[in-house]
């Protein structure tokens, strides 16, 4: 994200463009089995926020997207190696179709929204997460992981 943004920044500034950073719901919630992935996606949130502050005076907007699981071949391949606890936690956010996420991104850009959390379930979980300072996410994930482990 940093390299691509750096390569295109002059053109984006000239056209008063819009930068879209694709992160993940894992950046917000963290996930069992996704320590490195969640960390890298959380870094994208910080990158997007910093970029927003730097580019706003130049007329450039930034949107960061944090979707749950999206129906792509990558997720089918990953499911073959994911531990039961990871599968159980991932299922909490729902499963979105790529065209729905794309439409949501286009809408967010048109509305100049900074943060996009696609999917009703994920938005509700995000609101609860913020309202409870993450407690509800930890309690829910702990219960889901415990249940997944008891089945195996």
Locate the predicted segments by residue.
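Alpha-helical segment proximal to the catalytic Tyr-Lys
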Residues: 10, 53-57
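Conserved catalytic-site region of short-chain dehydrogenase/reductase
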Residues: 11, 27-29
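SDR active-site lid
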Residues: 57-120
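A transmembrane-helix-recognition feature enriched in membrane-embedded lipid enzymes
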Residues: 112-146
């Amino acid at each position: 994200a940093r390299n691509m943004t750096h390569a295109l920044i002059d053109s984006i500034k000239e056209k008063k463009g819009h930068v879209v950073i694709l992160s993940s719901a894992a950046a917000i919630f963290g996930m069992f089995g996704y320590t490195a992935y969640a960390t890298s996606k959380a870094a994208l949130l910080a990158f997007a926020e910093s970029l927003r502050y730097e580019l706003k005076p130049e007329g450039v907007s930034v949107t960061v997207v944090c979707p749950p699981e999206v129906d792509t071949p990558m997720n089918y391949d990953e499911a073959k190696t994911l531990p039961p606890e990871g599968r159980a936690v991932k299922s909490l956010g729902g499963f979105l179709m790529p065209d729905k996420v794309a439409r949501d991104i286009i809408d967010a850009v048109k509305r100049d929204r900074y943060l996009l959390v696609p999917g009703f379930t994920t938005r509700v979980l995000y609101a609860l997460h913020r309202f409870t300072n993450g407690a509800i996410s930890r309690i829910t994930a702990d219960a889901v992981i415990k249940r997944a482990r008891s089945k195996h």
